From Swiss-Prot:
Quaternary structure, from the entry: Part of the 30S ribosomal subunit. Forms a loose heterodimer with protein S19. Forms two bridges to the 50S subunit in the 70S ribosome.
Cellular component GO terms, alphabetical: cytosol; small ribosomal subunit
Family matches, as HAMAP family: Ribosomal_uS13
Magnesium among keywords: no
An annotated Gene Ontology molecular function: tRNA binding
Protein's recorded name: Small ribosomal subunit protein uS13
Species in which this protein is naturally found: Burkholderia thailandensis (strain ATCC 700388 / DSM 13276 / CCUG 48851 / CIP 106301 / E264)
Family note: Belongs to the universal ribosomal protein uS13 family.
Length: 121
């Protein structure tokens, strides 16, 4: 298995698909990395030479990926919450922050339904 940016890339996959195993790299960015490094994106990872892998590592190193990207996203959300802006408040409450309706739906953000309390007589 090839190791790029601290991630094991599956050997049986094409280079373009294998690079998407790295957090922060999708299909489009993977294809542009392959083109920039001169590696055929249809080539299997197991068929890559050490020189090819080194070129790929160099190109991937130009982007913010994996732990650094996760940390950056977390810090951005924390900043919004500290500011107390609308999006930060919605993050804090665990509700959708992009204007979706919450009277019904929004189950992914809100989590499973809680049982309603029975009224005492």
């Amino acid at each position: 298995m090839a190791r790029i940016a601290g991630v094991n890339i599956p050997n049986h996959q094409h280079t373009e698909i294998g690079l998407t195993a790295i957090f922060g790299i999708g299909r489009t960015r993977a294809r542009s990395i392959c083109v920039a490094s001169g590696v055929a994106f249809s080539k299997k990872v197991k068929d890559l030479t050490d020189a090819d892998l080194e070129k790929l590592r160099e190109e991937v190193g130009k982007f913010v990926v994996e732990g650094d990207l996760r940390r950056e996203v977390t810090m951005n959300i924390k900043r919004l919450m500290d500011l107390g802006c609308y999006r930060g408040v919605r993050h804090r409450k665990g509700l959708p922050m992009r204007g979706q309706r919450t009277r019904t739906n929004a189950r992914t953000r809100k989590g499973p339904r809680r049982a309603a309390q029975a009224l005492k007589k």
